[in-house]
Amino acid sequence: MAVAVVTSRRMINIGNSIRRCFILNHRFFSTELTPTTITPINQDHLLRVCTILYQQQNSPDSRLVSKLSSTKFQLTHEFFLQVCNNFPLSWRPVHRFFLYSQTHHPDFTHTSTTSNKMLAIIGNSRNMDLFWELAQEIGKRGLVNDKTFRIVLKTLASARELKKCVNYFHLMNGFGYLYNVETMNRGVETLCKEKLVEEAKFVFIKLKEFIKPDEITYRTMIQGFCDVGDLIEAAKLWNLMMDEGFDVDIEAGKKIMETLLKKNQFDEASKVFYVMVSKRGGDLDGGFYRVMIDWLCKNGRIDMARKVFDEMRERGVYVDNLTWASLIYGLLVKRRVVEAYGLVEGVENPDISIYHGLIKGLVKIKRASEATEVFRKMIQRGCEPIMHTYLMLLQGHLGRRGRKGPDPLVNFDTIFVGGMIKAGKRLETTKYIERTLKRGLEVPRFDYSKFLHYYSNEEGVVMFEEMAKKLREVSLFDLADIFQRYGEKMTTRERRRDRDQLLKT
C-alpha cells in the first residue's frame, strides 16, 4: 500500500513538470509557426504520451508499446516535434518513441525536420554510437539537408570525432549527396561559430582534394581564427589564399586588421591596411576605413586619424555618421572642442551616433554641463535618447562611485550601508565607509543601469518627478532635466496599456 502511494505521488510530480514544460513549448511553437502549418494536437494525449515515455523509458518493449497503444493518440509531425521538445537532453525517450512510430504507425513517414530534431537531441546527450548510426540511417533514407550537416559536424567535432566528420562527407556522397563547396562552407561556418576552428581546419584540409575551397571557405576560416585570437593561423590561411590565386578578400583583411588593433599591434595592422588600400583601394567601403579611424581616435592619435579620413574622402568613399562620431570623440578627448563642433556642423543628417560622440567626449574632459546641453538640443531636434545616453550623462555628473569586486564583504557592506542610509544615519554611514576604505576594501560601484532598470515602473515615474523637483531646489538643473526626461519617456506596461486604449477610442 505504501508503494502505491509513493508511485502515485511521483506520477503526479512528473505529470506536473511535464505539463509545465509542455505548455511553454506549446506557446513557443504557436508563435513560431503559422496557423496554416500547425496540425491541431490533443494536449491531454501529448501529456499522457510524455509521461509514459518518461516513466517507462527503461521498461521492456512490450510494456512500453502496450502503454502507448492504449493512449489512442494521433501521430503527426507536429506531435512528434512536441514530444521531442519535452526531452531536450534525454535520448532514450525520444529514440524509443521513434522506434515505436516506425513499427506501429507504418503510415507515418519522418521528414528532414523530425529527423534533425531527434538527431540533435541524441547529439546533445552525447550518445555518440547511436548518433553515428542514426546519421547514416537518415542519409540512406534521403532526409539529409544543410541543417543535418550542421548538426552532425557540430556534434562530432565537439566530441573530437574528427575522422567521422570527414567520413560523413564521403558517406553522404555515396548516398547521392555529391561533394558540394556550399555544403562544406556551411559546415565550416557552423564549427567556427562554435569556436571549433582547429576541427574546422582539419575537415577543410582533408576534404581539399575532393572539394575545391572557394573564397568564402578561406574567409570563414580566417574570421574563425581571428575570433579565437589565433592570428598566426589566420595569417597562414591568408597567405595560402593568395597562393591559390584568389584576390585579396576585403572582409578577411578587415577582420585581421580589427583583431590586430584589439591586441594593440598597430604596426602589423597598418601593414594590412595599406596592403588592402594598394590592392583593393577602389572596392573598400567606409566600414573598412572606420575600423582604423575608430582605433586611432580612441588611442589619442587624432592627427593620423585625420590623414586616413582625408585619404578616404579623396577616394570618394562615403563617410557615414559612425565615422564622423569617432572623429568628433577623438578631437574632444584632445580638447580640440572648436574643431569637433566644426565637424558636427558639417554633418548633413546627424543621428544619435553623432550626439553620443559629442556627449561621450565632453564627459571624458569633465564638461558634463555642456554634455547635458547637447542632450537638450538632441531632444529638440527630434532625436530620442536611449538608455546608453542616460548612463553616460549620469556617469558624467555623478562619476563612477566605487569599484566592482567579488569579495563577499563588499556585498555585506552594500546591504549594511544601504540600510544605514534608509535609517537616516548618513554621518555614521560616511564614517563606516571611511573605515572600510582604510582597511583596504573597495566600495562597490554604483550600477546606474540597474538603478534605471529597477525603477522603470509607475513608482519610478513618480520618484523621478520628485527627484527632479528636489534637484532643482538645490540648483542641480542638469541632473533634474535628465531624470525628468527619463521619467517622462519611460515606457511601462501600464502606459502602453493606456496608450493602446486611447488609440482604440
From Swiss-Prot:
Entry keyword set: Repeat
Which superkingdom is the protein from?
Eukaryota
Mind telling me what this protein is named? Putative pentatricopeptide repeat-containing protein At1g26500
Q: Which family does it belong to?
A: Belongs to the PPR family. P subfamily.
Spans of the PPR repeats are 145-179, 180-210, 214-248, 249-279, 285-319, 320-350, 351-385
Q: Which InterPro entries match?
A: Pentatricopeptide_rpt (IPR002885), PPR-containing_protein (IPR050667), TPR-like_helical_dom_sf (IPR011990)
Keyword Repeat appears in the UniProt entry: yes
